[in-house]
Design a protein with these regions (language model features):
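C-terminal luminal/periplasmic domains and tails of membrane-associated envelope-modifying transferases
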Residues: 3, 424-701
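Perimembrane helix-loop-helix junctions
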Residues: 5-7, 170-184, 192, 205-247, ...
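Signature aromatic-anchored transmembrane alpha helix within multi-pass, membrane-resident enzymes
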Residues: 25-29, 190, 207-211, 239-244, ...
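Transmembrane-helix signature of polytopic, membrane-embedded enzymes
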Residues: 25-26, 121-143, 162, 180-183, ...
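Transmembrane-helix motifs of polytopic, lipid-linked glycan transferases
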Residues: 108-128, 166, 170
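Short helix- or helix-capping micro-motifs
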Residues: 137-142, 149, 169, 192, ...
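Membrane-lumen/periplasm interface segments of specific transmembrane helices
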Residues: 237-274, 303, 397-413
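Hydrophobic, aromatic-rich transmembrane alpha-helices
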Residues: 300-328, 483
C-alpha cells in the first residue's frame, strides 16, 4: 500500500514499477527506525540546555497570557531574537503530556524532523528525476554522518533544514504548477511560516518567492510580448496572501516579534546576521576567533566533512545533466540558487561562524538531491553491464568510509571527516572534534556507575567543561560544577569530565590532553574525545585560594608540594609564578613561567607575563617580540595591544602604535586603556584629537 504522503507530494505514474516504489518505501521506513533508535545514546548538544530553558519561558509567557515576560530577558543568550518554534512546540508537548525524560523526547522529536527532511529531499528528487534519484537520495543520506549526527539532538539546525527544504520544494511545485490552487498554496504558506518561526533567516524563502515569480513572469513576457493586467493582479494578490499569511503564522510562537511585529523582526534579523557571541575554535591547526576566521572557513569545512560520494554526485550532476538543464533549466537553476545564495551571502558579509558548518545544514538536503540526480544520470549514461558494474563498485568504495565510520563510532556520527584530511585522525589537533559536547553523556554515565561501585554514597564534587547537571539529577551526593578546562586548578573538584572541545591544539598534538590522571578515555576512531579525570591532589586549588585570600606564604607551601611531582597544567606554574612575583622573587618567577611553557609553548597568559617582566626590566625589544607573539596567537588578547603600543611610542614608532590601538579598538571599541593611550599619542602633535579621545575615555566605563 503506497504511503499517504504520495498523494500530497507527487502522483506516481502508472508506468513506475511497484518494486521500485516498494524499495523507496522500505528504505524510507528503515531510515526512520534507524534514526529513532539512534537517539537512545545521544548526548545533550552544546546549545540544547539554554534553548530548552528559553522554550520553558516561552511556554510560561503564553500560559500566563503574556504576564510572565522573562522570555524577553536574554542579555547573554540573545534568544529572544530567535523564534525556535520547534523547541517551543516540543516543550508544549512535554508539559501537556507530563513527560519526565525531557531530553530523550526532544531527541526523538528532532530525529523525526531529520527523517522528514530526508523524506522530502527524496520526494523532491523523485519530482525532478524519478524514483531512481529518490532512492539514491535516501541512500546518500544513510551515509551522511554529519547530518545524521545532528539529527540526534540539534533542535536548532535540523528543524530549520526541514523547514527550508519544505519551503523550497513547495515553492518549486507552486511556481511550476499548471494551476495555483489552495492545494499547492497552503503547504507553501505553512512551510515558509515554519521556517520564519525558527529563525529570522526563514525570510529567505519569501525573497525567493518574489524573485522566482518575477523571473517566471519576465520569461512569460519575453515569450508572448503581452502583459495580462488581470493575471498580474491575481498573482500580486496571491503573493500578498502568501507573504502576509506565512509571516503572521510564523511569529505566533515568537513572543518578542509578536509584541513588536515589524521592528522586532528587523532587530532579530540584524542580531542574527552578525551574532554577537564569538568563540575560539581550532581551524587549520590554530585557535582563532569565530569572527576573525578566513573567508573560506565554511566552504573548507563542508569540503572536508561531506562524504566524497556526495561530492562525486555533485560533479556528475554538472557534468552529465545538460539535457535535464535544457528541459527544466529554471527548476534546477532555482534549486541551485537556494544552495549558493546563503553561502555566498555570508562569505560576502564575513558573518560570525563557528561549530563547523552546522548553521548551514539547511543547504545540505538540496546538495544531496543534486548529487543523487548526478549519480542516477551517471548510471543511466553507461548502460553497458561491465562499465555499470565498475561504477557501482566505485560508488560502494566511496560509501564505505562514511558507512563504516557510522558503524564504528555511533553516537558520535557528526565527528566525521572525509579522506581529504585523512579522516578524524588526520583532523585531530587541526580542526575541532566534539565541538557540540556529545561525549559528556557517556563520560557522565561511566563516572556515575564507577562511583556507585567504588565510592557508594560518598559526597563528591564533579567538574565538567559543559553543563551536565541533567545526567546527575538523581545523584544527590554528587555536586556538579561547570568550568573551562584551562581553569581547572582554580576550582574545587574531585572528578572532572572533559570533552575534547576548544582545547588548545598544542595540548592535543603534544599529547598533554588527555592528562595522565585520566581514569576513563572515550575515543572515536582511535582519537580521544572525552576524558574522565581523577584529581590526585587539591594543592593547586588550595594554593590558588590562599593567594586570593592574601596569604602568599601559605600559597607557596601548597605550590611547592605540587611542582615536585609531574605536572601537566601550565596554569599552575602561572599562578605559582604570580605568587612569587608578588613576593619579589623575580628569578623564581621567570623559572616557573619557563616550566609552564614547556607544557604549552603557546600559553598566552604566561607569554604576556614574561613580556611584562621584560618591559619592566627595560628589555623593550624582547618584550615587544613577546607581545607580538601573544597578539599573533590571540588577536583578542587586548591587554597586549596598549603594552606593545607603549613600547612603540618610546621607540618613536608613533604610526605603528596608533595602528595597533586602532586594531584593538576596532574589535573592542570600549577598551578604555587603548582609548587613553590613543589620546596620549596625540597629546603633543594634535591636542584637539587628544581631547576627543579624552572625552571618549570619560564616557567609557
Amino acid at each position: 500500500m503506497p504511503l499517504p504522503y504520495k498523494s500530497i507530494i507527487y502522483r506516481p505514474s502508472a508506468g513506475k514499477a511497484k518494486i521500485t516504489r516498494g524499495l523507496f518505501d522500505l528504505l524510507a521506513g528503515c531510515l526512520l527506525i534507524f534514526m529513532m533508535l539512534g537517539t537512545r545514546e545521544a548526548g545533550i548538544s552544546g546549545d540544547e540546555e539554554v534553548h530548552y530553558q528559553q522554550s520553558v519561558k516561552v511556554y510560561n509567557f503564553y500560559a500566563t497570557g503574556g504576564a510572565d515576560k522573562s522570555v524577553l530577558d536574554t542579555p547573554y543568550s540573545q534568544l529572544k531574537y530567535y523564534g525556535q518554534s520547534f523547541d517551543n512546540i516540543t516543550t508544549i508537548l512535554i508539559r501537556w503530556f507530563n513527560i519526565d525524560d525531557i531530553y530523550t523526547f526532544r531527541h526523538q522529536m528532532n530525529a523525526l524532523a531529520g527523517w522528514l527532511c530526508i523524506l522530502l529531499a527524496a520526494l523532491l528528487a523523485v519530482w525532478l528525476s524519478g524514483y531512481g534519484a529518490g532512492i539514491l537520495t535516501l541512500l546518500l543520506f544513510a551515509v551522511s554522518p554529519t547530518f545524521l549526527g545532528h539529527a540526534q539532538n540539534n533542535l536548532k539546525d535540523i528543524p530549520f533544514a526541514l523547514a527550508y527544504l519544505a519551503g523550497t520544494l513547495f515553492l518549486l511545485r507552486w511556481l511550476f504548477a499548471k494551476q495555483r490552487t489552495w492545494k499547492n498554496t497552503l503547504p507553501l504558506i505553512l512551510s515558509i511560516a515554519f521556517c520564519i518561526s525558527i529563525r529570522p533567516g526563514g525570510l529567505l524563502l519569501l525573497c525567493y518567492l518574489l524573485l522566482f515569480t518575477a523571473i517566471l513572469e519576465f520569461k512569460t513576457y519575453r515569450e508572448t510580448a503581452k502583459i495580462n493586467i488581470g493575471l498580474l493582479k491575481n498573482r500580486a494578490y496571491s503573493l500578498g496572501l502568501i507573504v502576509l499569511g506565512s509571516y503572521l503564522l510564523g511569529i505566533l510562537l515568537w513572543p518578542y516579534v509578536l509584541l513588536n511585529p515589524i521592528s522586532g523582526f528587523l532587530k532579530s534579523y540584524q542580531v542574527m546576521a552578525q551574532f554577537p557571541t564569538t568563540i575560539r575554535q581550532i581551524f587549520e591547526g590554530r585557535l582563532e576567533w569565530s569572527d576573525l576566521l578566513p573567508w573560506y572557513y565554511l566552504p573548507k569545512l563542508m569540503l572536508i566533512t561531506i562524504p566524497l560520494i556526495v561530492w562525486t554526485g555533485v560533479l556528475s550532476f554538472f557534468a552529465l545533466t545538460g539535457k535535464a538543464f535544457r528541459q527544466d533549466g529554471l527548476k534546477y537553476g532555482f534549486l541551485i540558487f537556494t544552495i549558493l545564495f546563503p553561502i555566498v551571502f555570508v562569505l560576502y558579509e564575513h558573518s560570525n561562524l563557528y561549530g563547523s558548518w552546522r548553521h548551514f545544514l539547511f543547504v545540505y538536503p538540496a546538495i544531496v538531491v543534486l548529487a543523487a540526480i548526478g549519480l542516477y544520470q551517471l548510471l543511466q549514461r553507461f548502460s553497458e553491464p561491465f562499465t555499470r558494474f565498475g561504477i557501482v563498485l566505485l560508488l560502494l568504495m566511496l560509501a564505505y568510509d562514511p558507512f563504516t565510520f557510522l558503524v564504528r563510532n555511533h553516537p558520535y556520527d557528526y565527528l566525521y571527516y572525509n579522506q581529504l584530511t585523512g579522516g578524524l585522525k588526520g583532523a585531530y589537533g587541526n580542526y575541532e572534534t566534539d565541538y557540540y559536547y556529545h561525549s559528556i553523556r557517556e563520560g557522565s554515565e561511566w563516572l556515575i556507575a564507577d562511583l556507585k561501585k567504588n565510592h557508594p554514597g560518598d559526597s563528591l564534587k564533579i567538574g565538567t567543561n559543559f553543563p551536565a547537571e541533567w545526567f546527575f539529577r538523581k545523584e544527590k551526593n554528587l555536586a556538579v560544577t561547570y568550568f573551562p578546562y584551562s581553569d581547572r586548578s582554580q576550582y574545587d573538584w574531585d572528578y572532572c569530565i572533559v570533552a575534547n572541545s576548544y582545547i588548545s591544539p598544542t595540548l592535543l598534538k603534544n599529547k598533554i590532553w588527555p592528562p595522565k590522571n585520566s581514569v576513563k578515555i572515550i575515543e572515536a576512531d582511535g582519537i580521544p574525545i572525552c576524558a574522565v579525570v581523577k584529581r590526585e591532589s587539591k594543592a593547586d586549588f588550595l594554593g590558588y585560594r590562599a593567594f586570593q585570600q592574601h596569604h602568599p606564604e601559605e600559597s607557596v607551601k601548597y605550590y611547592e608540594e605540587l611542582v615536585k611531582k609531574e605536572c601537566q597544567d601550565e596554569l599552575i606554574f602561572f599562578n605559582f609564578a604570580s605568587v612569587c612575583y608578588s613576593m619579589g622573587d623575580r628569578e623564581k618567577t621567570i623559572s616557573l613561567l619557563q616550566k609552564g611553557l614547556e607544557i604549552n609553548p603557546n600559553c598566552e597568559p604566561i607569554l604576556m607575563f614574561q613580556a611584562n617582566i621584560l618591559a619592566e626590566k627595560g628589555d623593550l625589544s624582547k618584550a615587544a617580540s613577546l607581545y607580538e607573539t601573544v597578539i599573533g596567537l590571540n588577536r583578542k588578547y587586548f591587554d597586549a595591544y596598549p603594552a606593545l603600543a607603549r613600547i612603540c611610542l618610546v621607540q618613536k614608532e608613533t604610526k605603528k602604535a596608533r595602528e595597533l590601538l586602532k586594531s584593538c579598538l576596532t574589535m573592542d571599541p570600549g577598551f578604555k586603556e587603548a582609548i587613553v593611550l590613543m589620546a596620549d599619542s596625540y597629546r603633543t602633535s594634535d591636542p584637539e584629537v587628544a581631547r576627543k579621545y579624552d572625552e571618549l575615555a570619560k564616557q567609557t566605563k
